[in-house]
Amino acid sequence: MTNIRKTHPLMKIMNSSFIDLPAPSNISSWWNFGSLLGACLAIQIITGLFLAMHYTADTATAFSSVTHICRDVNQGWIIRYLHANGASMFFLCLFLHVGRGMYYGSFSLSETWNIGIILLFTVMATAFMGYVLPWGQMSFWGATVITNLLSAIPYIGTDLVEWIWGGFSVDKATLTRFFAFHFILPFIISALVLVHLLFLHETGSNNPLGTSSESDKIPFHPYYTIKDLLGLMFLLLTLTILVLFSPDLLGDPDNYMPANPLSTPPHIKPEWYFLFAYAILRSIPNKLGGVLALIMSILILAIIPILQTAKQRSMMFRPLSQIMFWILTADLFTLTWIGGQPVEHPFVTIGQVASILYFSLILIIMPTVSLIENKMLKW
């Protein structure tokens, strides 16, 4: 008798994707983050759904409805903090996932990589709109500052901003539409994830050596299902510790004050996962230039495959490229720190140097270093 998982129309799709999928035998724990991102997305959708049952998208009641969730709803506080800190875990896994792709040359799977970049933009948009919903001080002013950046677009900028706001300022119409988009986008993300996996399974996974895995494959289950479960346990442990011991560690105290259009917070800053891009935006004095640099800080990922000059796919045996990669990582940490600092000396200068270094490393230094390594291979 044939196995039902191999014959049933629905189950055979699951079977060929998660059970009998031929996977490289040597992929390390850096390949765990795909499944962890799937787990994060599931946590966000489930907790978000329960929060939406009690939240009201109205400027008069949004802040108090979030307070009501935390105080009066059964286990509401844990649902709220799982959702808020779940977003941080989501971005942590995302950054590590992208870093893995850069280090091991996974960007050469161009369709998968490009869908991944679209996913990154979509997740960032979703997180930004979610941050506006509690309608605290940082929610309101964050929404005002970031949406206002679109006014830098020539000719249509001002009209575009007012169209997004639904009026002449961030108000009830803005909050309502942000809630609608924040609710629908995770489902669009889920669809994009399926496309991401579809393209990945067309080519098969990369591996740490960057070589072809065709000659040495093992079934995904039980080997990598068990490995992914271990990663999931670490993720849930970290998230649980964060939620139960210091749920407000990554938040902003200003967001515990209801939104007040007449009082500007001393330092307007987004959540920690946007700070690197925010620092790049602030380091350019020109508004349009800053917006372009902000977009390019993420979109630059799309041109990494074009800039690949190395003979070897992975950085595993390229020590000079490894050094440049870790300098880039340190630079991103620096940008994240600068994004959270006030706009004054010496932070402005450090931000400008770090921004120049960020683009220089990706566009010029790393491709040049790869060419040097190619020459060294011939010695």
From Swiss-Prot:
- Look up the record and report any one GO term of the cellular component aspect: respiratory chain complex III
Q: How is the cofactor bound?
A: Binds 2 heme b groups non-covalently.
Give the primary localization class: mitochondrion
- Determine the domain of life of the protein's source: Eukaryota
- Does Oxidoreductase appear among the keywords? no
Which keywords accompany this UniProt record?
A: Electron transport, Heme, Iron, Membrane, Metal-binding, Mitochondrion, Mitochondrion inner membrane, Respiratory chain, Transmembrane, Transmembrane helix, Transport, Ubiquinone
The entry's a ubiquinone-binding residues are: H201
Where exactly are the transmembrane stretches of this chain?
Answer: 33-53, 77-98, 113-133, 178-198, 226-246, 288-308, 320-340, 347-367
Question: What is the topology of this protein in the membrane according to its UniProt annotation?
Answer: Multi-pass membrane protein
Assembly mode: The cytochrome bc1 complex contains 11 subunits: 3 respiratory subunits (MT-CYB, CYC1 and UQCRFS1), 2 core proteins (UQCRC1 and UQCRC2) and 6 low-molecular weight proteins (UQCRH/QCR6, UQCRB/QCR7, UQCRQ/QCR8, UQCR10/QCR9, UQCR11/QCR10 and a cleavage product of UQCRFS1). This cytochrome bc1 complex then forms a dimer.
- Tell me what else is known: Heme 1 (or BL or b562) is low-potential and absorbs at about 562 nm, and heme 2 (or BH or b566) is high-potential and absorbs at about 566 nm.
**Record's protein name:** Cytochrome b
Organism of origin is Microcebus berthae
Q: What are the top taxonomic ranks of the organism?
A: Eukaryota, Metazoa, Chordata, Craniata, Vertebrata
